[in-house]
Amino acid sequence: MNLIEMGQKLGLENLTPEVAVDDTRPVLYGYASDLLSDVLAHALHGGVLVTVQVHLNVVAVAAHAELAAVVFSSGRRPEEAVREKAVEEGIVLYATDQPAFDVVGRLYELGLRGTHA
C-alpha cells in the first residue's frame, strides 16, 4: 500500500496536497507516539507517524527520521507554519478526527506493522 491508498482507505484529510507522493513506494511501517525522542529512536525510515502533537518539532523529527508521513489524530490540526515547513521538507501531513488508537488499528488491518523498541 502506498500513501495515496492509505489516505483514501482511512478517509484522511491531506493537509499537504502540494507534496509529490511517490505512488510506487510502499508504506510498510507505522509508529504511534507523542514523545518525539521516542520517534527519533525507534521509528523506521519511510514509515508513518500517528500523533496528536501538532507543533513544528513534529515536522523536524519526521524529516530527520525520514518518515513518509505524519497523521494527526483526534481532530488535531497544525498551524499554517507547520504545514508550510512540511511542504518544504517533503513530508506528507494527514489529519483525521479518529482517535489515534483507531487509526493505528486500521493501519494494522491494512498491513502496516510497528517497530519493536
Regions found by a protein language model. Give the residues of each.
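Glycine/Thr-rich beta-alpha phosphate-binding loop at enzyme active sites
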Residues: 25
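Feature captures the catalytic cores and cofactor-binding loops of soluble hydro-lyases/lyases
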Residues: 22, 31-48, 52-117
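N-terminal, charge-rich interaction modules
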Residues: 1-20
